[in-house]
Amino acid sequence: MDVNPTLLFLKVPAQNAISTTFPYTGDPPYSHGTGTGYTMDTVNRTHQYSEKGKWTTNTETGAPQLNPIDGPLPEDNEPSGYAQTDCVLEAMAFLEESHPGIFENSCLETMEVVQQTRVDRLTQGRQTYDWTLNRNQPAATALANTIEVFRSNGLTANESGRLIDFLKDVMESMDKEEMEITTHFQRKRRVRDNMTKKMVTQRTIGKKKQRVNKRSYLIRALTLNTMTKDAERGKLKRRAIATPGMQIRGFVYFVETLARSICEKLEQSGLPVGGNEKKAKLANVVRKMMTNSQDTELSFTITGDNTKWNENQNPRMFLAMITYITKNQPEWFRNILSIAPIMFSNKMARLGKGYMFESKRMKLRTQIPAEMLASIDLKYFNESTRKKIEKIRPLLIDGTASLSPGMMMGMFNMLSTVLGVSILNLGQKKYTKTTYWWDGLQSSDDFALIVNAPNHEGIQAGVDRFYRTCKLVGINMSKKKSYINRTGTFEFTSFFYRYGFVANFSMELPSFGVSGINESADMSIGVTVIKNNMINNDLGPATAQMALQLFIKDYRYTYRCHRGDTQIQTRRSFELKKLWEQTRSKAGLLVSDGGPNLYNIRNLHIPEVCLKWELMDEDYQGRLCNPLNPFVSHKEIESVNNAVVMPAHGPAKSMEYDAVATTHSWIPKRNRSILNTSQRGILEDEQMYQKCCNLFEKFFPSSSYRRPVGISSMVEAMVSRARIDARIDFESGRIKKEEFSEIMKICSTIEELRRQK
């Protein structure tokens, strides 16, 4: 029988059907090839929005820079970056007036963080631009390389492990006339293989020292590497995102810490909270506006969209904000916070890999690296690319483009939210001094504006005033993409509000299914996702039960572990059938061993091993949870693990799930082919780093681990700890005198070696 799809919706309120219109099933689009074109688009657009600013030349790097601040007053309808400093400062002053002491308190909180943060904070994060190798690396490796180079150039403040001391090194490095760096390179040789007697190419990895003069070093330190943003749904065009180097990261972290502390105290800020907490915060603002718009007032809400938020923001504006927020604070604190925006005013965008050319006729492919774009003949390019390159040429230096105005995506989310909220704050009656007033919500570039007024003219006037006020600080509300409704129906950060938040279930669809980590983790993550959606996203019991059955089916197909008594033939069925027949208590077998599924919506919170433990045969228990089993690489067993789940919107979320280590918690080995590439040196560095950290953790189990106070290196800390522990063990008779003196001897040897080095 054919089902008419409209019948499905007869009983469903319109707002609940919204989620069926979202492009969230199936794989998201990924980008291929280089991001060079997208990056050039960003650079050119940013300059176009600020074109009436003043041009200057950076005295250190020779880069041409455009400064749109306090430029002409912005025009209607056209997005522009001409923020006016005095307007921004005034908005900050009014924000402080409405929230007495907010900046003062946030500064105090941040100061404490600045004093305590360790440099290892910078190892968090994924890909980072590594200026020593001029490409992206995992954050930990990039940091290790930077510290290594600093050390070999006589900068040693960071030995203490405090982030602030590392930043002192960064500042000093910028004053040096030259820096010596170590880079990796590959040599290829043709040699005869002894076994096969064939010629093979042998690659060897070398490290070579290279001197970089002040100008080149500064360009590298100020460079943001660019990539294409992947997996973005609902867009036709891809766009570029930036990853900054280690010199910038620490300074940005402190600025964002300050801004986060301010956002936490602002009721209109959608950051840094998320999920249900965010919904509650938003609902409060809406409730306030609706309660106050008594029968005499109209209340309307704009679901807002800003045109090119990042490209019209300006680091110079952020500098003004920070200067205001930190007034009356100690000089060192003001200095350290003002460095990030200053670095961003002088930033360079790396254009990525360059362009790929292929000649169909001659079957040739060649890469034109970004460095060549400044000099290459443009006749090889098509019309649109030619225009891009012509526009960007005056800005190019060594394959990077000078990009003074604008912020790259995701750098100062918190601080830009503070700016947005400061405009929402001006909507109070005491500031508008008329019959209309407004309030709203801001989360990075997304906003919702609620306007109240006695009549429609008042609403219109309020919206106009908000629009123009935003223009003065470089925020461009898009008239085309924002829409207005009676208060009670709007969308904000993909939350749909209809007299309360409607669950937008389609957002969670991508996270259902089998993750592909291993049998144990996948089972646990799968049921946790269903459980979480019952709690947070209106997933009803019947649908949840169905989701569970689909998940189990999916899981069995993925791991080819159909029930032992099934007819389905796979390459595992022979073994699983044998196990099924040998097992007395078949209910005790895990699903991944061909057992039955005992999950239902009431017991999703229990890990499968625990759920079935009492039902298992004894020898099965022994095999399943045996620490000596050679097939299991047992990490220390944490009771809770973190999985990365992909919601449809926003970054990958980290989700906790219960982890019980069994023979099914295997960890796949690293691909061998990496060992023959130029990445090898990096891999070795990374393993070295890992080993050091593991060793350190052996000396300082987490229970006794306090933040190291005072200045000592990891080695010194471990040696002194070893001495203390040895003495205690010797005095309590746990170790013999010979062992004690041997430990003491080893400690002295280590210290001696350190002194010689």
From Swiss-Prot:
Phosphorylated by host PRKCA. Signal peptide: none annotated. It is found in: Host nucleus; Host cytoplasm. It catalyses: RNA(n) + a ribonucleoside 5'-triphosphate = RNA(n+1) + diphosphate. Residues 286-483 form the RdRp catalytic domain. It is an enzyme of class 2 (transferase). GO terms for cellular component: host cell cytoplasm; host cell nucleus. Influenza RNA polymerase is composed of three subunits: PB1, PB2 and PA. Interacts (via N-terminus) with PA (via C-terminus). Interacts (via C-terminus) with PB2 (via N-terminus); this interaction is essential for transcription initiation. RNA-dependent RNA polymerase which is responsible for replication and transcription of virus RNA segments. The transcription of viral mRNAs occurs by a unique mechanism called cap-snatching. 5' methylated caps of cellular mRNAs are cleaved after 10-13 nucleotides by PA. In turn, these short capped RNAs are used as primers by PB1 for transcription of viral mRNAs. During virus replication, PB1 initiates RNA synthesis and copy vRNA into complementary RNA (cRNA) which in turn serves as a template for the production of more vRNAs. Belongs to the influenza viruses polymerase PB1 family. This is RNA-directed RNA polymerase catalytic subunit. It comes from Influenza A virus (strain A/Port Chalmers/1/1973 H3N2). The gene is PB1.
